[in-house]
């Protein structure tokens, strides 16, 4: 992984190749995926300093070309900042990546008091699943759920046993 020193000079460690990580939060592995930096936009969710964060600023070093991301932790609302991973898979080829979370998809069963009741991919029921308080997601969920047109699904990010719905979609009849 790279870093910036106090004089704003970028440094890259030799073993900065992108890698999948596993955590020990709930006994199941919390996995990450590598995302090429040219695909990352403001508002995307990345893993910064080991925490799921929503990107609020992207900068690029003029000297090294390395990307730097500032994000807000989805669960604690703290700021985290990290530089992109740089790897050289072949001579004169430079690839910059960041780690992103693996999202889960749950089916919404009920909505109550600012949280949802949802069914996981394995059929377990999750009570009181919080919804991210941005991008009017709660209003969009309510509208889709009350319309009754298709099955409402939420994309969920988890961190050390805690989960939060961060986006939604409606799956219509033939794809249930």
UniProtKB/Swiss-Prot annotation:
GO terms for cellular component: cell septum; Woronin body. One of its GO terms (molecular function) is RNA binding. InterPro entries: Hex1_S1, IF5A-like, IF5A-like_N, NA-bd_OB-fold, Rib_uL2_dom2, Transl_elong_IF5A_C, Translation_prot_SH3-like_sf. It holds the Pfam family IF5A-like_N. GO terms for biological process: positive regulation of translational elongation; positive regulation of translational termination; translational elongation. CDD domains: S1_Hex1 (cd04469). Residues 1-31 are annotated as: Disordered. Residues 1-16 have a biased composition (Basic and acidic residues). Signal peptide: none annotated. Disruption phenotype: Impairs plugging of septal pores and leads to the loss of cytoplasm in hyphae severed by lightly drawing a scalpel blade. A motif (Microbody targeting signal) lies at residues 174-176. Residues 1-16 form a propeptide. Major component of Woronin bodies, fungal-specific organelles that occlude septal pores in order to separate intact from damaged compartments. Hex-1 binds directly or indirectly to the Woronin body tether that in turn is anchored at the rim of the septal pore. Forms oligomers. Self-assembles into hexagonal rods. Belongs to the eIF-5A family. Hex1 subfamily. This is Woronin body major protein. It comes from Neurospora crassa (strain ATCC 24698 / 74-OR23-1A / CBS 708.71 / DSM 1257 / FGSC 987).
């Amino acid at each position: 992984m790279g870093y910036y020193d106090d004089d704003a000079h970028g440094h890259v460690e030799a073993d900065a190749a992108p890698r999948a990580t596993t955590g020990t939060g709930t006994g199941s592995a919390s996995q990450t995926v590598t995302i090429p930096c040219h695909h990352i936009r403001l508002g995307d969710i990345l893993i910064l300093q080991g925490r799921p964060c929503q990107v609020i600023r992207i900068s690029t070093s003029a000297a090294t070309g390395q990307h730097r991301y500032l994000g807000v932790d989805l669960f604690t609302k703290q700021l985290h900042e990290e530089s992109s991973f740089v790897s050289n898979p072949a001579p004169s080829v430079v690839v910059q990546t960041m780690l992103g979370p693996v999202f889960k998809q749950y089916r919404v069963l009920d909505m109550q008091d600012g949280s949802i009741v949802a069914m996981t991919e394995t059929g377990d029921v999750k009570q009181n699943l919080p919804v991210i308080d941005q991008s009017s997601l709660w209003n969009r969920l309510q509208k889709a759920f009350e319309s009754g047109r298709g099955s409402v699904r939420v994309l969920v990010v988890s961190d050390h046993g805690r989960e939060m719905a961060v986006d939604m979609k409606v799956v219509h009849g033939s794809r249930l």
